[in-house]
Curated annotation (Swiss-Prot):
UniProt protein name: Urease accessory protein UreG
PANTHER family linked to this entry: UREASE ACCESSORY PROTEIN G
One Pfam family, short name: cobW
MF terms (GO), sorted A to Z: GTP binding; GTPase activity; nickel cation binding
Species for this entry: Chelativorans sp. (strain BNC1)
Keyword Ubl conjugation: no
Gene behind the chain: ureG
UniProt KW Ribonucleoprotein keyword: no
Residue stretches in coiled coil: none
CDD domains, alphabetized: UreG (cd05540)
Function: Facilitates the functional incorporation of the urease nickel metallocenter. This process requires GTP hydrolysis, probably effectuated by UreG.
Length: 207
């Protein structure tokens, strides 16, 4: 299923430890039998996330490209996306039938956003472990990403976070934009994320 516009490019951002790599693993394992997929991971000085996905057998290693960004991680997904664009071009040449490319950013702050030249859809992951105040802090990634994923809901009792407060704050700052509460380590909420990608990425129409 090859789109005339090329593969759907999905940017996945979020702070360190929020669950970006776990989200990539879940999406790859959930969708790889229906779609031709690949992933680009960004780390500052290593290719750790790429190695993790390979070790988890989320997808064949030749479909994983690790990018070492150096410096500030959000520069490589917005101001100067050349390293990521080169990785995408490499994957497109190697796998001409690609339907989806995931682009996982390095750990970043709440202001980081993807260049529209790099990502067609943006998913932003935050963790309940960061505290219930995170949604109301706002920031472009929280307020304007195509889908906000509030992950690690299972940790709420241990960090004193009220999930109802987080939902209410999220609905206020996102002004109708979609969000989902997840516990990706247990795959809870994963189906909602997949359904969002298929609908908003036009995959269901193209199938």
């Amino acid at each position: 299923m090859k789109s005339s516009n090329g593969p759907l490019r999905i940017g996945i951002g979020g702070p360190v430890g929020s669950g970006k790599t776990t989200l990539c693993e879940v999406l790859l394992k959930s969708m790889r039998d229906r779609y031709s997929m690949a992933v680009v991971t960004n780390d500052i000085y290593t290719k750790e996330d790429a190695l993790i996905l390979a070790r988890l057998q989320a997808i064949s290693e030749d479909r994983i490209v690790g990018v070492e960004t150096g410096g500030c991680p959000h520069t490589a997904i917005r101001e100067d996306a050349s390293l990521n664009l080169a990785a995408i071009a490499h994957l497109n040449r190697r796998f001409p039938d690609l339907d989806i490319i995931l682009i996982e950013s390095g750990g970043d702050n709440l202001a980081a956003t993807f260049s529209p030249d790099l990502a067609d859809l943006t998913l932003y992951v935050i963790s309940v472990a960061q505290g219930e105040k995170i949604p109301r802090k706002g920031g472009p990634a929280i307020t304007r990403s195509d889908l906000l994923i509030i992950n690690k809901t299972d940790l709420a009792p241990y960090v004193g976070a009220n999930l109802d407060v987080m939902r209410s704050d999220t609905e206020k700052v996102r002004e109708g934009r979609p969000y989902v509460m997840t516990d990706l380590s247990r795959r809870q909420g994963a189906e909602e994320v997949v359904a969002f990608i298929e609908k908003m990425g036009g995959l269901a129409l193209a199938a």
